[in-house]
Amino acid sequence: MKWTTDKVRQTWLDYFTAKGHLALPSKSLIPVNDPSLLWINSGVATLKDYFSAKKTPPSKRLANAQICLRVNDIENVGFTSRHQTLFEMLGNFSIGDYFKEEAIGFANDLLVNHYHLDPKRFYITVYQDDELTFNTWLKHGIPASRIIKCDRDRNFWDLGLGPCGPCTEIYYDRGERFDPHKVGEKLFFEDIENDRYVEVWNIVFSQFNNDGNGNYSELAQKNIDTGAGIERLVAILQDAPTNFDTDIFLKLIGIIEQHCKHKYDTNLYFKFDQKLNEAQSAFRIISDHFKAITFTIAEGVLPGPNERSYIVRRLLRRALLACKKLDLDLKFIDPMVDAIISVYGSYYQQLQGKNQVVQQAIWKEVTAFDKTINLGLMLFEKSIAHNALQPQVAFQLYETYGFPIEMIKELVDKRQLQVDWKAVEQLMEQHRLISKQNSNTLSFEKQNEHLVNFKTASEFLYEANEITAKVIGLFDEQYQPVQKLHNQSGYVVFDQTVLYATSGGQRYDEGYCINHSQNDQRVSFQGVFKGPNKQHFHFFLTGSFQLGDKVILVHDGKWRQLVKNNHSLEHLLHAALQNEIDPLIKQDGAFKSAQKATIDFNFSRALTWAELERVEHRIRQIIQQDIQREEIFTDLEGSQKLNAIAYFEEEYSNHELLRVIRFGDFSVELCGGTHVEHTGLIENCFITDYYARGTGRWRIEIISSNETIAAYLNEQNGKLSETINSLHNTLNNIANPALNKQKTALTKQLNHFHLPQVITDLRKCQALLNELKITVNELKTEDFKWKQKQLAEKIKQELLELAKQDKAYVLASFAAVDPKLLSQVAQAVLNQHKNKLFVLLNQFNNSPSFMLLGQDVSKCIQLLKAHFELKGGGSNNFFRGSFNESVDVSKLQAILDTLQ
């Protein structure tokens, strides 16, 4: 096969690299610091910060092949030619560099001269007011008869706020084979859904800024954002009927065929056998969904009940139901996962080595789903009424139990039931609206032209503590440039600074300046962040500055040292996890401040504390070895030769000078943060916490320095002392004589409990005290049962004594007695005095209540209602309720006397 998917991808990247673009690796499917998206769903989604000017791109020309996931049209997957959940998006991007004419030229050149597509089959859409784009296509030989001018709905990309602009789309005519009704060009010009005219490329010209009120202004930095779905392009180049008939899909479908009696027919597109189409759809659903499942689990999202985890669960369950249609032997699962990782792993390196993790997670969910199907079928059978199924039940089967709509319809048809499918669709639509955050839209922030245009150079000095600096930029709180500020809040930029700006998970430096030009005013900074052109913006709440002012700039040396300790410690923790637990563990988020460091990572199971202590011990060894820090400046190729760890959320130019931080052979990472000069300065480390951040995602919190650890130990000892005192109080309140021996032994153990003097003893002491706490609580429970028994006997004797009176009722008042206990005791006494009515008042949990047991309960209720407002409920011989007012016992007794 001439054009494989790998070749199509590489041709794209090679072409744009030759045109001066930096080819970026595919990012994780899980968005980084972007709560607006559940998954990365387009090639540009990972580049939002560059387009909004929050971050400076490593190159003004970028290209990528990005793995994407969309699940808003999941019901269509398997039944159309091109709908998929997981797909690759090819893209080229210009950030303040080339614009319309060059972007169109690249697209035309690549498609015609490199992919060798016939330009006579090109059909183009342009925005109706975009004459430049229309004329540019004419220059490339596309006749006006194959260019359509469209309105805003079709050819203007606008999210209502922020960067926006017109777009142009390239369609390719696949010929009459894909036009069975011979409709012709009308399909394209009237935008009718079809398989003949296929969109292969969309180019967005981001040239305006929408202020949110429909007012448009020219962007300071005009951008190009393009996208071409690789599966569509491959289908055209391979002359495949659908995306599912291309090389990678056919390889996966071949594995399915080996485990079932059905066969996939690549020519079925041109046939009309509905029964065969059901089997075809099953092949497509399984192959598509298993690709998505493999990628998501490999990135640490395991099937589960919430958010991303629920999407993975739903995909797997839909695939498993498709397996049932083929009577597919589930032994296909392991070779399917192996094949997916094999065909994609060379480019998408996050898959490498994840075979077993993915397979184990799938099999665990398969077992769980067997039970779920049975529960769903039980719900289905139980919910049938009057030969109908309620829409809410159909939706519940779909949403909660993972039954596809087609399966529900099969169940309904077999039982000849009536269902209001329109109501079901309305419920599904409501659910889709709630889940809209995963739809195919992006929310770019408003581009700030003042920050973009501010390009005066500023330098960060890593090692200096105090410097003289000059004010080169001044902005108010709305980022508007100003000449001066007087006792106001705002942002100041200096020609050089010693204050680190928040980035790479490291918090900004604490610091201040002395402004000689403003009567030596001291101004403290409450934040430092990087602007789009890499200058450090210093935020202040109250200060006076003027452009050109000279200041003394100082950072807090103690703060900086603690941050350096913790940042270097985070690197060592990352390396220790890889060395001691699993070499495939990768940091997936980190935070470093003066107080602590944290690291997030994905792993298939929880680590034990024994494993964490092994990691801790390894780090301490590295600290004790006092390894010198090496700071190496090299290019991307040089850093790769050093095996330096880089992260998906960072992009690095081939020609950019990169900073590598190395501690011997133990840790080598690309990093722009501040670090200790040698590991001995970290002094010590201690893991303070470890917990789940979601399914398969974990966080470790760790501290450093003897002073910080001593303070932490002192704090924990305070908590241990509080626990010891609390346990002593519990033991002192135990009254059961039978427990005296155990009580004495536990009291002795608590008296001899020694608080840890060194941090390495803390966990052992915490575990020991926790065991004592469990034992004391068990004793407390036994004592409570004994006290309840004693109380029950006391109440019983009191009621028996009252029952001897020559009255039709027994009236008694109690305080703080468990209503359940009171009811049980009263019932036992009632069994001996069946002709009595028991009226029991009780003040429990500060709530006055009453209880009636025995004969004439209903008669008594009517009598009481005539005198009091009350509420409650019960049966013929039992009532429990409360009065809406305080009740005088003597008055109540007088009323009850009338029952005689």
Curated annotation (Swiss-Prot):
Zn(2+) binds at H567, H571, C671, H675. Its EC number is 6.1.1.7. Binds 1 zinc ion per subunit. It is found in: Cytoplasm. The keyword Translocase does not apply. It is an enzyme of class 6 (ligase). It comes from the Bacteria. Belongs to the class-II aminoacyl-tRNA synthetase family. Transmembrane segments: none annotated. Consists of three domains; the N-terminal catalytic domain, the editing domain and the C-terminal C-Ala domain. The editing domain removes incorrectly charged amino acids, while the C-Ala domain, along with tRNA(Ala), serves as a bridge to cooperatively bring together the editing and aminoacylation centers thus stimulating deacylation of misacylated tRNAs. It comes from Mycoplasma pneumoniae (strain ATCC 29342 / M129 / Subtype 1) (Mycoplasmoides pneumoniae). GO terms for molecular function: alanine-tRNA ligase activity; aminoacyl-tRNA deacylase activity; ATP binding; tRNA binding; zinc ion binding. Keywords: Aminoacyl-tRNA synthetase, ATP-binding, Cytoplasm, Ligase, Metal-binding, Nucleotide-binding, Protein biosynthesis, RNA-binding, tRNA-binding, Zinc. Its cofactor is Zn(2+). It catalyses: tRNA(Ala) + L-alanine + ATP = L-alanyl-tRNA(Ala) + AMP + diphosphate. InterPro entries: aa-tRNA-synth_II/BPL/LPL, Ala-tRNA-lgiase_IIc, Ala-tRNA-ligase_IIc_anticod-bd, Ala-tRNA-synth_IIc_core, Ala-tRNA-synth_IIc_N, Ala-tRNA_ligase, Ala_tRNA_ligase_euk/bac, Thr/Ala-tRNA-synth_IIc_edit. One of its GO terms (cellular component) is cytosol. GO terms for biological process: alanyl-tRNA aminoacylation. Pfam families: tRNA-synt_2c, tRNA_SAD. This is Alanine--tRNA ligase. Disulfide bonds: none annotated.
